[in-house]
Amino acid sequence: MTRESESGLPIEPVYGPDALDGWRAEEKLGEPGAYPFTRGVYPSMYTGRPWTMRQYAGFGTATESNARYKQLIANGTAGLSVAFDLPTQMGHDSDAPIASGEVGKVGVAIDSVDDMRVLFGGIPLDKVSTSMTINAPAALLLLLYQLVGEEQGVPADKLTGTIQNDVLKEYIARGTYIFPPKPSLRLIADIFKYCKAEIPKWNTISISGYHMAEAGASPAQEIAFTLADGIEYVRTAVAAGMDVDDFAPRLSFFFVARTTILEEVAKFRAARRIWAKVMREEFGATNPKSLMLRFHTQTAGVQLTAQQPEVNLVRVAVQGLGAVLGGTQSLHTNSFDEAIALPTDKSARLALRTQQVLAYETDVTATVDPFAGSYVVEKMTDDVEAAALELMLKVEEMGGAVNAIERGFQKSEIERSAYRIAQETDSGERVVVGVNRFRLDEEEPYEPLRVDPAIEAQQAGRLARLRAERDQRAVDAALTELRKAAEGTDNVLYPMKDALRARATVGEVCNALREVWGTYVPSDVF
């Protein structure tokens, strides 16, 4: 019986040579590390070294998160990934009334360079690669990181890492936007230019499908809308006067890995192929690195369950295997208790150990792109590619990603997909072990990690001391220069860095930009 994939595409019970009738390997695949990069962006992939194990972490104060990072490094992680709390993500200080009840809850609270200094205390920034999941205020957190690097004596050209910096997906699926699309895109172009000149090894954006997938997007929708956003960013940078080969090699992407391994592998391979063609054929990129879709993967949090949480260990292992078979460059494996609360030390360690078992106790790293030539995976790769291209064409016909966002297209498509998933789960058609089948009459008790509510008062106290100690006139002068740059065409990151060095807070810097650029109010389109 034919099954339907997550993207609504057919999966036949048996595949044979006829599934690839007229299929040409040299056109569809090429060699690993060569156009169209279907088989991976590097010739040797994991046969030379494994992917980067980059575990996402951050909670409470900078002191607590710093301890967690040091523990992860001691356990063998090769890269850090910083989670920020909602006030930081929205550009508010911890003592702002709107931040009440949210400080340090879903990530670490960062209000100023003082907090950033503590967050990376004892961690040499020239020895570690750091990813920061931050979007609307991405420029601020990047500059705070650079300032801490300067204090450590680390040259900016030795700093490596990534800022997510993908505001378009915030309008589609997540909601942590601040400014309207036009100034947001201007800010992203300023970041591209600044990093080209000042922090050349930094990945300036991580164009993200993960959050769309968590909101309900199918695999085809995930890569279609993500790549459409990527096209918008490339056009923005080119319109700002940049040569495509000057910034495209530092673009990166971020996708989800579900338990449906075959379609996930097909999705990753299709995404690489589409992006390579777009960059070469539409934008005329000639640097091979400009054509490479390099991506980070996180296992699907939306598939984790609060019921029988230990079963999530199995789900995460399966999801991680799919990411590796699909050729990810780095991977975060979720902790089994994340459907309940922030990970404990033990669950975070088990999540990292899951990756280490995949890398060192299996043979998936022994050969490049193990599914190459598989009838089912090659057919599914072609099918996912075709479905994604159809959606991308619809976005183009609306005038690009921003116009489609204003019309509510991507959001409504994702909501329809999410509704279908919910219906199938409620009816039992979609089996979720421990939820709608194989349930326990009584769940075992589980004690989650809890964030101390006193953290909010602690952060407010730190802010009060900072404001009492700093040179307020220097802060005011720097913020005035920032407003002038925002009103004009100068790159805002240079005066922004001066303000942050003078110990202006994240909220103060964002408020200065709000005064000039305003804030985004979503349409009521559904």
Model-based region annotation:
Residues 49, 95-98, 168-170, 206-209, ...:
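Short acidic (Asp/Glu) and glycine-rich catalytic loops that position anionic groups and cofactors
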Residues 243-247, 285-299, 307-334, 343-368, ...:
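Flexible glycine/proline-rich, aromatic-decorated loop/lid segments
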Residues 54-56, 82-85, 131-135, 162-164, ...:
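Generic beta-strand/beta-sheet core signal
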Residues 101-105, 169-179, 212-217, 255-260, ...:
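Short beta-alpha connecting loops at secondary-structure transitions
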Residues 3-22, 31-37, 86, 344-345, ...:
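Flexible, glycine-rich loop/tail regions that form catalytic "lids" or insertion modules at the edges
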Residues 74, 78, 121-125, 150-155, ...:
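Generic secondary-structure signature for well-ordered alpha-helical cores
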Residues 1-258, 263-264, 282, 289-296, ...:
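Catalytic alpha/beta active-site cores
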Residues 111, 129, 134-137, 149-151, ...:
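Phosphate/diphosphate-binding loops
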